[in-house]
Amino acid sequence: MAKQSKNRVKLNKQYKSIGKIPVSALKKISEFMDLPALARDIRSSENNMVKHNHRHIDELEEQLKQLGITKEGYAEFVAKNYNQIRLGNKPLSLILAVLLENINHIAAVHLHYDKRENFWLVTTVHAIKPRNLEKIPLIWKR
């Protein structure tokens, strides 16, 4: 058992906490998936984002460089400013989106719930077109 505890501490060090999901949103999310009541923490890891979906990141990274923003900074911006939560395309996954007026693309991050560690992990960062976002089921809105 002690060995498992050491692994957990080591695992958590690689993730940075970048936001929280409101309790009101968790109530809505629980209508779509079975989650513990305290599954609010959103965490990020550069290695994890690259591992899960390098195509989106490569496309976005050049644009972000021009703006002087890192991938991690982009994920953190979305995690702190999202105004919609949509259902992800995989089990236990969500999309956080920042919708602003008069914009052609929407800042978005994909999250996956880690049951073992009880947090939401950013798996992908990207910009999505409004018409594509509208096709994804809306769970919660500010």
Residue ranges of predicted features:
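Ribonuclease/tRNase effector modules and their secretory precursors
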Residues: M1-R142
